Regions:
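N-terminal Rossmann-like dinucleotide-binding module
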Residues: 1-62
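C-terminal glycine/acidic-rich active-site capping loop/insertion
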Residues: 1-2, 11, 143, 191, ...
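C-terminal capping/lid region of NAD(P)-dependent oxidoreductase domains
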Residues: 4-11, 136, 163-167, 378-392
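Glycine- and charged-residue-rich phosphate/anionic-cofactor binding loop of Rossmann-like
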Residues: 39-42, 347-367, 387
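A structured beta-alpha segment of the ubiquitous adenosine-cofactor-binding alpha/beta core
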Residues: 66-85
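Beta-strand-loop-alpha-helix segment that lines the small-molecule cofactor/substrate pocket
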Residues: 87, 93-145, 160
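Predominantly a Rossmann-like dinucleotide-binding segment in NAD(P)-dependent oxidoreductases
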Residues: 137, 144-238, 292
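Glycine-rich, aromatic-lined ligand/substrate-binding cores of catalytic
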Residues: 204-291
């Protein structure tokens, strides 16, 4: 159980790009980063409005001279300081992620980037290569993967409790945008605007979350090919989709399906991952994230609860409070930020033995998600043809 002790001997000097006073996601990043006392927020370019960003930064306790007007100035000035930042979080609109992450790596910084990492697999591959060249990590915030029960599922599958995996069923299908809410809500408009959102809406914004959760649970599975059909039920959103179906074939013979939607009227998140093996199945639902359903053929279904001593050591390592108490998304994000900090520390110490088996959503995961969306769009726009899935 985590008890507030730092996993590192010191706090990392941390900065932010984006995440200002009007940013919901920026608050989530700060809550996660500061939970375990392994980051200290020292600098930032927090807002496109420099004065507004400076005022907000001062409210957060950042000294005025380290509240910068833009990310270029942030990286340049901090590089000149003996106490300059060593890691930066990128919490800006999608269309800026590539340029900012690239500039941060070139400035010698570790990066924690909101997903998507960028818009194209070519850009993502460039960031993978640059990360290796600079010997800096890039963490990608697939926040739901930080829940304790995801690690429990991963261990159960690794231990063979499900047997050979046959089926992976994934969905993230909410109903909050079943009407053209973006016409009144500016905060939603960017999600359906290609310039800002990229080549897709729900495939990139929603589906990549359960996709990564499933891949965290069963990392041995590799997609071989896929087929996608996407729709714009609110016509003004075209060419971006607000609903999509994806079929996948894996290299071990397993099959997968994804339903992602913003027009599933009446639904909340409805994000679920079900993995079916030859002996048993598991299912996780993000609206009940502290539970994992374990179903063995011919036996009553078992609901595993977070915080209980029967869980695997890997799952209990992310435990923050005793069983029976709920943990939520901020705790899941904090688990990831803790892992990013450990990866940064190990990278700086060149501790390759630690990093070899250490899991966190890394730059390769970012590449995988970007390429998956790219291939889904390619398939859908070609009349839902099957397309190969070979990472560039």
């Amino acid at each position: 159980m985590l008890n507030g002790l730092k996993p590192l001997s010191r706090s990392l000097r941390w900065g932010m790009v984006g995440g200002g006073g009007t940013s919901q996601i920026g608050y989530s990043h700060r809550c996660a980063a500061l939970r375990d006392n392994v980051y200290t927020l020292l600098a930032g370019a927090l807002d496109v409005d420099a004065e507004r960003g400076r005022a907000f930064g001062e409210q957060l306790g950042i000294t005025p001279e380290r509240c910068y007007a833009d990310y270029q100035t942030l990286f340049r000035e901090e590089a000149q300081r003996p106490d300059g930042i060593e890691v930066v979080s990128v919490t800006t609109p999608n269309n800026t992620h590539f340029a900012i992450t690239k500039a941060a790596l070139e400035a010698g910084l570790h990066v924690i980037c909101e997903k998507p990492l960028c818009f194209t697999a070519e850009e993502a591959r460039e960031l993978v290569d640059l990360s290796k060249k600079q010997n800096k990590i890039v963490g990608v915030t697939y926040g739901y993967a930080g829940y304790q029960m995801i690690q429990q599922a991963r261990q159960m599958i690794a231990d063979g409790l499900l047997g050979e995996i046959r089926i992976v069923n994934m969905q993230f299908a909410h109903g909050f945008h079943n009407q053209a809410v973006e016409l009144q809500a500016e905060s939603t408009r960017w999600r359906v605007t290609p310039k800002f959102a990229g080549p897709s809406y729900v495939l990139g914004d929603l589906a990549t979350h359960p996709l990564f959760v499933a891949e965290t649970m069963a990392p041995q599975l590799n997609i071989k090919r896929l087929m996608c059909s996407r729709q714009s039920f609110v016509p003004s959103r075209a060419p971006l989709e607000d609903n999509a179906f994806v079929l996948m074939e894996y290299d071990n013979g397993a099959v997968g399906s994804m339903w992602t939607s913003a027009v599933n009227s009446g639904a909340m998140h409805s994000q679920k991952v079900r993995i079916v093996g030859e002996k048993a199945s598991i299912e996780w639902w993000d609206e009940h994230p502290n539970q994992l359903s374990y179903e063995v053929q011919g036996e009553p279904a078992r609901i595993l609860e977070r915080g209980m001593p029967y869980l695997s050591p890997n799952a209990l390592a992310d435990d923050r409070i005793g069983g029976g108490h709920p943990e939520g998304l901020f705790e899941a994000w904090a688990n990831l930020y803790r892992r990013y900090a450990q990866a940064i520390d190990a990278t700086d110490r060149d501790d390759r033995a630690f990093l070899q088996d250490f899991w966190y959503p890394d730059v390769e995961a970012g590449l995988h998600g970007v390429y998956w969306v790219e291939q889904c769009v390619k398939s859908a726009d070609a009349g839902s043809q099957w397309v190969d899935f070979t990472l560039p």
